[in-house]
Amino acid sequence: MLIKVKTLTGKEIEIDIEPTDKVERIKERVEEKEGIPPQQQRLIYSGKQMNDEKTAADYKILGGSVLHLVLALRGGGGLRQ
């Protein structure tokens, strides 16, 4: 089934997934298309952050559903003087 992943810039990435695919696999597909490592991705669906170990079916994702991609950038160590 085709779903869309929307980035913060408004870009929509179309991805073909199976209901049995884990969120981890969806992140791998985003990496294939956008080059963003899965560990930097946070996927949001229905206002909730998705767990890597759950499947698309667990979240009741259907064809045409839109997931939101937020980047989790590693924090630095405070302000430098």
Swiss-Prot record:
<dbReference type="GO" id="GO:0006511">
    <property type="term" value="P:ubiquitin-dependent protein catabolic process"/>
</dbReference>
<dbReference type="GO" id="GO:0008104">
    <property type="term" value="P:protein localization"/>
</dbReference>
<dbReference type="GO" id="GO:0036211">
    <property type="term" value="P:protein modification process"/>
</dbReference>
<keyword id="KW-1017">Isopeptide bond</keyword>
<feature type="propeptide">
    <location>
        <begin position="77"/>
        <end position="81"/>
    </location>
</feature>
<dbReference type="GO" id="GO:0150052">
    <property type="term" value="P:regulation of postsynapse assembly"/>
</dbReference>
<keyword id="KW-0833">Ubl conjugation pathway</keyword>
<feature type="site" description="Interaction with UBE1C">
    <location>
        <position position="44"/>
    </location>
</feature>
<keyword id="KW-0007">Acetylation</keyword>
<dbReference type="Pfam" id="PF00240">
    <property type="entry name" value="ubiquitin"/>
</dbReference>
<feature type="modified residue" description="N6-acetyllysine">
    <location>
        <position position="48"/>
    </location>
</feature>
<comment type="function">
    <text>Ubiquitin-like protein which plays an important role in cell cycle control and embryogenesis via its conjugation to a limited number of cellular proteins, such as cullins or p53/TP53. Attachment of NEDD8 to cullins is critical for the recruitment of E2 to the cullin-RING-based E3 ubiquitin-protein ligase complex, thus facilitating polyubiquitination and proteasomal degradation of cyclins and other regulatory proteins. Attachment of NEDD8 to p53/TP53 inhibits p53/TP53 transcriptional activity.</text>
</comment>
<comment type="similarity">
    <text>Belongs to the ubiquitin family.</text>
</comment>
<dbReference type="GO" id="GO:0005654">
    <property type="term" value="C:nucleoplasm"/>
</dbReference>
<dbReference type="GO" id="GO:0005634">
    <property type="term" value="C:nucleus"/>
</dbReference>
<dbReference type="InterPro" id="IPR029071">
    <property type="entry name" value="Ubiquitin-like_domsf"/>
</dbReference>
<feature type="modified residue" description="(Microbial infection) Deamidated glutamine">
    <location>
        <position position="40"/>
    </location>
</feature>
<dbReference type="GO" id="GO:0098978">
    <property type="term" value="C:glutamatergic synapse"/>
</dbReference>
<dbReference type="GO" id="GO:0005737">
    <property type="term" value="C:cytoplasm"/>
</dbReference>
<dbReference type="InterPro" id="IPR019954">
    <property type="entry name" value="Ubiquitin_CS"/>
</dbReference>
<dbReference type="GO" id="GO:0045116">
    <property type="term" value="P:protein neddylation"/>
</dbReference>
<dbReference type="GO" id="GO:0031625">
    <property type="term" value="F:ubiquitin protein ligase binding"/>
</dbReference>
<feature type="cross-link" description="Glycyl lysine isopeptide (Gly-Lys) (interchain with K-? in acceptor proteins)">
    <location>
        <position position="76"/>
    </location>
</feature>
<protein>
    <recommendedName>
        <fullName>Ubiquitin-like protein NEDD8</fullName>
    </recommendedName>
</protein>
<dbReference type="GO" id="GO:0019941">
    <property type="term" value="P:modification-dependent protein catabolic process"/>
</dbReference>
<dbReference type="GO" id="GO:0006508">
    <property type="term" value="P:proteolysis"/>
</dbReference>
<keyword id="KW-0539">Nucleus</keyword>
<comment type="subunit">
    <text>Interacts with AHR; interaction is direct. Interacts with NUB1; interaction is direct. Interacts with ESR1.</text>
</comment>
<dbReference type="InterPro" id="IPR000626">
    <property type="entry name" value="Ubiquitin-like_dom"/>
</dbReference>
<dbReference type="GO" id="GO:0006357">
    <property type="term" value="P:regulation of transcription by RNA polymerase II"/>
</dbReference>
<feature type="region of interest" description="Interaction with UBE1C">
    <location>
        <begin position="70"/>
        <end position="72"/>
    </location>
</feature>
<dbReference type="GO" id="GO:0098794">
    <property type="term" value="C:postsynapse"/>
</dbReference>
<feature type="site" description="Interaction with UBE1C">
    <location>
        <position position="8"/>
    </location>
</feature>
<dbReference type="GO" id="GO:0031386">
    <property type="term" value="F:protein tag activity"/>
</dbReference>
<dbReference type="GO" id="GO:0009653">
    <property type="term" value="P:anatomical structure morphogenesis"/>
</dbReference>
<dbReference type="GO" id="GO:0070062">
    <property type="term" value="C:extracellular exosome"/>
</dbReference>
<dbReference type="GO" id="GO:0005829">
    <property type="term" value="C:cytosol"/>
</dbReference>
<dbReference type="GO" id="GO:0030162">
    <property type="term" value="P:regulation of proteolysis"/>
</dbReference>
<dbReference type="InterPro" id="IPR050158">
    <property type="entry name" value="Ubiquitin_ubiquitin-like"/>
</dbReference>
<dbReference type="InterPro" id="IPR019956">
    <property type="entry name" value="Ubiquitin_dom"/>
</dbReference>
<dbReference type="InterPro" id="IPR038738">
    <property type="entry name" value="Nedd8-like"/>
</dbReference>
